[in-house]
Amino acid sequence: MYFELKENKPHGTKDDPFSTYHIKNEGRSFQIPVHWHDELEIIYVKSGFLTVSISGENYIGTPGDAFVVSPGTLHFMGSQAGEVDYFTFLFPLEYISFCTDDMLDDKLLTPLKNGHLMIRPRIKDAAKELCEQLAEIYMAKNDEKKLEIAVQIK
């Protein structure tokens, strides 16, 4: 692990650990530096073209594409085209755990957290729909809807 590349920015709060970032870049190329963090991250491309690199694998995200970055995984994103609109959703794996020490924790969440299991970066169509809903909720900034989606995720 490259400790010097760890992103030290806190994401979320104790009461609301789910963080959403909306990045709308118009007209200039940019790159978010290579980094890693303890949270799971979902990257959703709303419009434009986004270069996403996850564990050294490069992808070109187009409108509707979504990617998963496992905790502790080196990644970066950027755009040479200049115009891109995308969202990142970050949350600790505990956010989707029922803390019951069940099969979900044993077979999925604990191995993900410990770096022993990697999720394929490209997300399938059903999960893309969830990303679109999350983006719409963020854009509406509706706290009641945020709670509703949190309940659906859990």
Q: Where do the language-model regions lie?
A:
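Generic protein-terminus/edge-of-domain signal
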Residues: 1-60, 106, 117
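A hydrophobic/aromatic-rich effector-binding and dimerization subdomain
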Residues: 2-18, 74-138
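Short acidic-glycine-tyrosine-enriched beta hairpin
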Residues: 56-71
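Basic, amphipathic alpha-helical hairpins
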Residues: 135-148
